[in-house]
Regions:
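NAD(P)-cofactor binding segment of oxidoreductase domains
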Residues: 1-21
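SDR active-site strand-loop-helix element
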Residues: 20-26, 68-70
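Short-chain dehydrogenase/reductase
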Residues: 40-53, 86-94, 116-117
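Substrate-positioning beta->alpha
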Residues: 70, 77-104
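Amphipathic terminal alpha-helices
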Residues: 156, 161-172
Length: 172
């Protein structure tokens, strides 16, 4: 779906000259160092991430497109445990949707996410009942230890500021 389906959608958008916005993932980066910029080297960590990179490859060839490398989760967080040793740049889906409206006319690649933090710390802000879980080294699920994003490009476009609890200055 992420590769062939995206290639077909890209072709259709190009034929009709329609803007294409593709949601990719922060997992296309190696996931070891964190603070990944849009032009950093890519090395997907699992099959899902490889499929998203395949989709990106099709979209990238179309000039009227925007690739968003997104790090998001649902609110409320649906799991009872959260990793305390995995760093990421989570942002809630509803906040990503608000950002999308501000980026709709942009082109290229933009990282979308919140500040770098451990998953547990992010979730704990809204769910005090969440418990800690550690991901073991050499995990079989292909979870990177630090897939946090450099979001400076997004901040510059949005004139972002951190209010302390919500990381947006966006009104729709």
């Amino acid at each position: 779906m992420n590769i062939i389906g995206t290639a077909n959608i890209t072709k259709a958008c190009e034929e009709k000259n329609v803007k294409l916005i593709y949601f990719s993932t922060n997992y296309v980066y190696p996931g070891t160092a964190g603070n990944y910029k849009e032009n950093d080297s890519l090395l997907p960590v699992n099959n899902y991430a490889w499929s998203k990179l395949g989709g990106e490859s099709s979209v990238h060839l179309y000039k009227n497109s925007l690739i968003l490398r997104v790090c998001m989760t649902e609110k409320p967080f649906v799991h009872k445990e959260a990793f305390s040793n995995i760093k990421t740049s989570f942002m809630y889906q509803e906040d990503v949707a608000k950002i999308l409206f501000k980026l709709i006319n942009k082109k290229g690649i933009i990282n979308i996410g919140g500040p770098s933090m451990y998953i547990y710390d992010f979730v704990r802000k809204n769910n005090k009942l969440i418990t800690k879980k550690n991901l073991k080294k050499n995990n079989k699920i292909g979870m990177p230890v630090n897939s946090s994003l450099n979001i400076n490009k997004m901040k510059k476009i949005l004139r972002w500021y951190n209010t302390g609890t919500i990381y947006l200055n966006i009104k729709i």
